[in-house]
Amino acid sequence: TEGREVSTTMVFVRILAKLLKDKEIGKLVVPIVPDEARTFGMEALFRQVGIYSHAGQLYDPVDKDSLLYYKEAKDGQILEEGINEAGSMSSFIAAGTAYNTHGINMIPFFIYYSMFGMQRVGDLVWAAGDIGAKGFMLGGTAGRTTLNGEGLQHQDGHSHLLAYPVPNLVTYDPAFAYELAVIIRDGIKRMYEDQEHIFYYITLMNENYAMPEMPKGAEKGILKGMYKFHASDKKSLKLKAQLFGSGTILNEVIKAAKILEDDYRVACDVWSVTSYKEIRRDALEAERFNLLNPTAKQKESYIEKMLAKEDGVFVASSD
């Protein structure tokens, strides 16, 4: 972002706006919001594509005089469901299974307060997995450190744990804009080009910070679940630490690395961990192959390959 501070939620809304404008797939994108469209900065989409209403706009919204007013239309594209996560998840399932039911590859993006997803409609998430729904669930305002103003009810630090058991749910906790872009692009490829029966859960933050450029060769690691964001250049230091960070906490990990190097003479490599679930999934697959094929060449998991030559203390932090 060239020094400009934005949140990953803002980045997602920009990605969504561009997808909606795409001449090929724009008409297939289904934005679904239970209640918090303005909280997520999505009001620009009201004017761009409108909010779907089978009857059209039957009243004058209170913000009619503003540029980005609450615009309902018969041809609107946003599903604004009110405070109704269960109904929104049902819309997600309907759109996410349209490829099977109607032969149309709809691409739903269901964004909501992350505390009110897995914790509130977990059964429907399992149903989506069972029925083969595709699409993206976005847990907005995730984490426990950047939404203190709204109280403990919104401080979600555990939705990823609830997402772990769903086998075909691919989960990510990205820190930077380029990570989010890579994940969404690959998700569209896997679900709609490769026809994999998976769906996605991605947490988004509301903390604003400058987004760096993508390090060369990082794309594979982003999708696999981890990559080295910064390698220490303090080769002369005897002590070493490997610091893992996810989501917005990665910024604090980067700061911690500098403090450790400058004040305590501990060389620190910083790793961005985008998905512990994907790392674990890969490790379990390697372990299973090795167990069932004892005479074949044994597979090495991604995390084993990445950390084989790394030493020092390993510290993992997330929000």
List the predicted regions and their residue ranges.
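Flexible inter-domain linker/hinge segments
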Residues: 1-26, 212-221
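Accessory "access/gating" subregions that flank catalytic or transport cores
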Residues: 15-20, 25, 29-38, 44-61, ...
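Short coil/turn connectors at secondary-structure junctions
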Residues: 25-29, 73-76, 102-108, 131-136, ...
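Short beta-strand segments
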Residues: 33, 111, 138-141, 201-205, ...
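Thiamine diphosphate
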Residues: 41-162, 164, 171, 179-185, 244, 254, ...
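Ferredoxin-type iron-sulfur electron-transfer modules in oxidoreductases and energy-metabolism complexes
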Residues: 176
